[in-house]
Amino acid sequence: PNPDLFPPRMIRLSDHIAAAGGWLSLEAFMQLALHHPQEGYYSTAIENIGSRGDFSTTPTLSPILAKAVAARWKEACARCGRRLPLLEIGAGSGALAVKVLEQLGFWNRLNTDYVIVESSPRLREFQHLLLGSQAKIYSTMEKALKHCGGKAFIFSNELVDAFPARVFEYTEEGWREVGLTVKDGAVREELRPVRQQPLFSHMLEYDSQPGQRLEIHDSYARWFTGWLPLWNMGVMTVIDYGDEMERLYYRRPQGSLRGYKSHQVLTGEELYRHPGLTDLTCDVNFTDLLELSRNCLGDTVTLMTQRDYLLPYAENTPQDACLLYTSDAA
C-alpha cells in the first residue's frame, strides 16, 4: 500500500500526561515518542535511512568504519583464541552490516555468525530484506547472547544517543527534573524536585548556573546492566557523539536535547509538537559512560576519539577526510 494514503499517527501527548498523573518526565516522553509500539518514531515514521532520510551516519558515507570494525574483530579473536560472533546492536538500515561483511572476506563470512539486535520491528524488516540469511536478527540482547553462547565481539554505532534521557535544570533551589504538563490546553514544561537519583551519574552533585540543563542516560544504564551478566567473553566497542562533561555543556545552557524531522533541527517546545514523527536525541556524556563501564567492567575500558579509532584504516578520499576531521564521536 501507498504509505502516503496511511500517514503515521501522531501521539496524543496530553492523554499520556493525564495517564501519568499530570506530569510526564522527559525520559518517559522520549520513550513514548521513539518506542511506542504502534505510534513511536522507530515503529512507524522511519522511511529512509541515509543521506536523504532522517539519519545521515558514518556507514552510509564511507567504508572506513567497516574496515575498522573488521580489523578490531580479528584482533579480538586472536586475543581470545577463538572465532567470535560479531554482534551489532542497533543496526539501523543494515548499511554497516553489509560493509563489515564485505570487509571480512569470503572465508570469514562463511564461518562467522553475524548477529544483530534491533528493537524496532520496522528496522528489523529493513535488515531482513537487505541481509537475508547473512545475519541472525534478534529483538533483545538476551536472545542474541544466548545464540552466541555468551561470547561475542559486540559493537554499536550511534546507539546510546538513541536511548531516552532524563533532563535536569539547575535552579536557585538546586537541580530539578524537567517534565511535561498540560496548562490551558497546551503541553508545557514543568520542573519538579528530583525524586530518584540517577543510577551511575554524579552530575547532580555539582552546582551550576541557574537555567543550565543537562541530560543523563539512565535508561541506557538500566538496559546495559540488565544483559551484561550474560556476556562472558569478547570485546565491546561503543561509538557515539558526545564529549566529557566539562566540554559537553560548555556554552550550552540548554543542554543538547534536540529533534530531527526531515533534516530540520528542532529544539525547545518544537520537540513536543510532532511526537512519534520526530527523531529525538541528545549527545552522550562520556564521563558518565566511562563511570558506568568501569563500574561494570573494570579498568580495561578506554576512551578515544572516532578520528583515532578510524585513522589507521583511512584512505585519501573526501569522505574519509570529512569523517576524520569534522567528527567529535568517540
Outline where the language-model segments fall:
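Conserved small/polar residues in nucleotide/adenosyl-binding loops
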Residues: N2, Y325-A330
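Anionic group-transfer/hydrolysis microenvironments
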Residues: G90, S120, L159, G242, ...
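A mobile, often basic/glycine-rich helix-loop segment
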Residues: F155-P198, P253-S262
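Conserved acidic residues
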Residues: K151-A152, G234
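Short helix/loop capping segments that flank catalytic or ligand/cofactor-binding pockets
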Residues: Y42, F163-A165, E246-R247
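Rossmann-like AdoMet
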Residues: F6-I89, S93-K151, F168, D308-L311, ...
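Long, Lys/Arg- and hydrophobic-enriched amphipathic alpha-helices
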Residues: L199-S327
